[in-house]
């Protein structure tokens, strides 16, 4: 019994690193480091135990060819071929990843070899793969494997032999005009193949294909350049807004734009569209959580469909039109199930195709998701219903929206304005606003929308009554009424007399007595301001303690760095305006605290060490390790001082004079020595250096039997 308990404990044992990884995934399901830990652990376990981890992995990253391949290889290793085929059915058509497709072909080749129909199945698999992934820049090996497979097929009789030659030639000719790496080698192999069949016919066959091959080879070089730097194995994660991600997005878009520019210079619109869509498919494997990529792909298909329809190719036009709808469907069914932008774009696309029932199903599908705010969905749904089916249909959607407890006040504003603008019925709009006021009377934004509507109608009495109702009913908390009071004052300033203005100001001061105690003049600013014009300078407004309620509200709604500066004028005088300069992020700075007596090789300031450049890393690997050098160590300061004191000569003659201590005596004619012994033996005296006593007494005389000098003199003679 104790042995069985130990076995169960061993089976249930979970390593600490796995527990930490699981905890990280609870906080962030897209933590790639945590997933790497789980993958390594799964690879060391039996497939029956690891399958759950793999299923979680491909569910979290359904577009990652690398992760699907890991899962499939684990099943192949366990010889679970029925499960392998089901996995291929789940991922192969959706994930156009070159390594995954190579794995598929390898699986068919290894497992179907003993079947009677192996040759047909293998040929179908290769044709299927080339049709889907043949435009991949790294697809050379698939083309070559297919050709070698066809060459190895046994052919009995001349008819079968001709069939095989035709099949091989067809694949060669398709491959030689397809831009990819190693296209030159494929072309050379094709030349040899044709020459091996019929050398006389080969010349014409090669000449016919040569121009297309040269074009494909040119494009292949551009293709390789534009794909350089793309991280094509990165799993698709939600936007992180990092510089590295922005760089990858930019590179992917450049690749797609390059394909759109028609580098092959072909007139076949179908081929252009297929190549562009292949680029989009490759991009979506990595950037599947970016809605703009999905939308642009669908838009491109829609444009191509219209272009083909204009040319009369109705079959391909319909094919691309349906494929555009399929792009939207894939997006909202997989990675972007809650992305309203794509739902709305999908609905508009189907509306343009007059498929209204489909549009209703799209909106209802989004509304069925429980953990979303459906307010904007109902608003767009109402607008569609009014456009496509009339005002009555829009009213039905509004009724449905009122019954949904998740909706907010915006649907009432939309419905009221829709009635006013479309049915021209002010009374219906007025009733909707009144109905909403009972439910949302404590929300300033709704009250302001109602006020704007009445102001637009120029109904002064009704507007004034609404102000009084809202401000005296007690439904609106005092802390939320600031903007209503500001709007009331602006209203009276525009249409009322001075007495009514002063009355509103007094009531407003009473409502905010604690906040504006001693700052009565600040309230005066609102009486005289207009839009972004103020009766005081910015510094004076600060001194008054003035606070613009409407501006503060707008700043809270609009993201400051992107939109606010262009919409909200800055309260600055011309004198106060100073040029904006780029400033460092001081929060990231490290205090300057140099180490005292820092050891050699260590940066004196903490945090000052930086990564070595790649070229320097290579050099450092070639050099011996530091422990091999025991000295002597150069005194850098003294060495630099010597360099500083050195006088660099401007001419060769001056350099010779400094080195030798005097001008050289050159022999003009005869066999005499070039230099005198006095010059050669004169000691070199450095500037700014004390002379030794021995040097002052005289020059050092060279040895009598100086063999080196004797040989030099013989050469000169």
From Swiss-Prot:
Residues 684-705 are annotated as: Disordered. One of the multiple factors required for polyadenylation and 3'-end cleavage of mammalian pre-mRNAs. GO terms for molecular function: mRNA binding. InterPro entries: HAT (IPR003107), Rna14-like (IPR045243), Suf (IPR008847), TPR-like_helical_dom_sf (IPR011990). The modification N-acetylserine is found at residue 2. Transmembrane segments: none annotated. It is found in: Nucleus. Its main location: nucleus. GO terms for cellular component: nucleus. The modification Phosphoserine is found at residue 691. This is Cleavage stimulation factor subunit 3. HAT repeats lie at residues 45-77, 79-110, 117-152, 163-196, 221-261, 271-303, 319-352, 354-387, 458-494. It comes from Pongo abelii. Homodimer. The CSTF complex is composed of CSTF1 (50 kDa subunit), CSTF2 (64 kDa subunit) and CSTF3 (77 kDa subunit). CSTF3 directly interacts with CSTF1 and CSTF2. Interacts with FIP1L1. GO terms for biological process: mRNA 3'-end processing. The lineage of its organism: Eukaryota, Metazoa, Chordata, Craniata, Vertebrata. Keywords: Acetylation, mRNA processing, Nucleus, Phosphoprotein, Repeat.
